[in-house]
């Protein structure tokens, strides 16, 4: 059996945001005993990621690393009409990707103790983000 739902995550400022609980609240119940959850964000300037959920410094450090890797206002950018943060956001999105697949075991997301789901928002003002969640049983 396959179930699917679409929902919006609330708008976030630029940065890496722990959204595990916000996503979990939107998932249809009950989750299967064994299955897979695929999450897909329908945007090109943000990404989904799994990272450490305990120390908030990880979020700050990830933002700093990404900004160091992909800088704004580079003279070779041609796609600039949507602002100086837009082309770097597309590049960062391509590095991280727009989907995650998480195993479901015993009716729960089977993630490690220190793992959480992140929305990495690469725009200064990205707005709400549309997520498609597909559960495979």
Feature roles, as predicted:
Residues 1-137:
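Active-site histidine-anchored catalytic micro-motif
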